[in-house]
Amino acid sequence: MLNKLNLPIHIIGGGLAGSEASWQIAQLGIPVILHEMRPQRLSEAHKTDKLAELVCSNSFRSDDSLTNAVGLLHAEMRLAKSLIMKAADANKVPAGSALAVDRDGFSQTVTESLENHPLITIKREEIHDIPENWHNVIIATGPLTSPALAYAIQAVTGTEALSFFDAIAPIIYTDSINMNICWYQSRYDKIGPGGTGKDYINCPLDKEQYEAFIQALKDGEKIEFREFENVPYFDGCLPIEVMAERGVETLRHGPMKPMGLTNTHTPKVKAYAIVQLRQDNMLGTLYNMVGFQTKLKYSEQVRIFRTIPGLEKAEFARLGGLHRNTYLDSPTILDETLRLKKKPQLRFAGQITGCEGYVESSAIGLLAGRFAAAEYNNTYPSLPPKTTAFGALLNHITSGYIVTQETEKHSFQPMNINFGLFPPIDSTNHQRKTMQYKEKKLAKRQAIVERALNDCTQWLNGLK
């Protein structure tokens, strides 16, 4: 009986997943030791020693729980008393219908919450291997797992981790943006958490400027990665220049789409493309370039991005960069409670399991924490229904194979939460014959959301 021995649960990695897992376990009255290698050892992307540091965007994406899958996941996490969502809500900044946060305030809130919890001990040390006398362990080291621990994980799992490139976008000082050219507006004037409908700074481009910009992206000098040349990108975080290579019009229909925006300086002139900047901190002194993750050389970033109208004199607080992410072939090696089949005392959580995104990583950390707590109390974990966002995401990780028709081989890819992961629903009761396609699609999503929230509430109530 592990609980009678009063042994703590060990969590390796103080990112989003590890922080959330620690909180969930401690809130259930179980001691936790959280191991974090920073500041003893920094990764190639981290800049601070704070827990739950956001290394890429400051956005948790849409907070619309009625029609958006990630917004639904937000809602379920709030129901489960998530620390990550509590910290995000406390540090939100204007971002239209999205939930974006002051990244420093957010990580500070998480760090202080964990440091002040009487059942959580934080050890600042790098873990090179997993001690045999640790009987209940969650590995939440994320996509930037240190080489030594990655090797230890590979040795235990008996399989090579898969990898892909991930990139981060530049951040600009607000006072260096030319507001005689740019203007404040959220797409379609949407008002979200902490927002006003004027939460983004917009930079307009005409057709000639846009095409010149695309060519500059293609021609710009990129950082070369000899060691990782054959590692693919994750489609949800493609470098801007890679998107430009896919076609001249790609960016106009992606992060630079002009729809739903009107230039307040010249309202009768429709922009051909628009670059959006999103507030990055509560003070409003920093804005990040939405969708502009890049592997361009630093000097090229400054030169090319200053050709964007309104950014001619832009000063950069941080330039974009690129790092390697790793994830496991989870459906092969993990069971339904995220335990390693070969070594059940080990459980994995977060992005290393093959989920993609801040919220998804935190959600899997939440589940892993609750599963580990149940095991500590000698009960089999109660799985979230597959009809919930929690359950849909967990099911993808533990059984989300894609069979390729060409080779008939099983393939597992990182995935954001989306409605395609949910079981089908009979939405005829929510639809009328007179509805158009978009209306029927909306009604179906709302039916999925209603079912998910009801099932999630019942599941959580059953855990009490």
Curated annotation (Swiss-Prot):
Known PROSITE patterns for this protein? GIDA_2 (PS01281)
Instruction: Just give the chief location class.
Output: cytoplasm
Annotated keywords = Cytoplasm, FAD, Flavoprotein, Methyltransferase, NAD, NADP, Transferase, tRNA processing
Question: What reactions does this protein catalyze?
Answer: uridine(54) in tRNA + (6R)-5,10-methylene-5,6,7,8-tetrahydrofolate + NADH + H(+) = 5-methyluridine(54) in tRNA + (6S)-5,6,7,8-tetrahydrofolate + NAD(+); uridine(54) in tRNA + (6R)-5,10-methylene-5,6,7,8-tetrahydrofolate + NADPH + H(+) = 5-methyluridine(54) in tRNA + (6S)-5,6,7,8-tetrahydrofolate + NADP(+)
**Compartment(s) where it occurs, according to its Swiss-Prot or TrEMBL record:** Cytoplasm
Cofactor(s) recorded for this entry are: FAD
Any one Gene Ontology MF annotation carried by this entry is: tRNA (uracil(54)-C5)-methyltransferase activity, 5,10-methylenetetrahydrofolate-dependent
What is a single cellular component term in the Gene Ontology annotation? cytosol
Q: What is its EC number?
A: 2.1.1.74
**Which positions in this protein are listed as binding FAD?**
13-18
User: Domain of life, per the record?
Assistant: Bacteria
A single GO BP term for this record reads:
tRNA methylation
InterPro entries associated with the record: FAD/NAD-bd_sf, MnmG-rel, MnmG-rel_CS, MnmG_N, TrmFO
User: Which EC class heads this enzyme's classification?
Assistant: transferase
Q: What's the stated role of this polypeptide?
A: Catalyzes the folate-dependent formation of 5-methyl-uridine at position 54 (M-5-U54) in all tRNAs.
The Swiss-Prot or TrEMBL record describes its family as follows: Belongs to the MnmG family. TrmFO subfamily.
Recorded protein name is: Methylenetetrahydrofolate--tRNA-(uracil-5-)-methyltransferase TrmFO
The organism encoding this protein is: Bartonella bacilliformis (strain ATCC 35685 / KC583 / Herrer 020/F12,63)
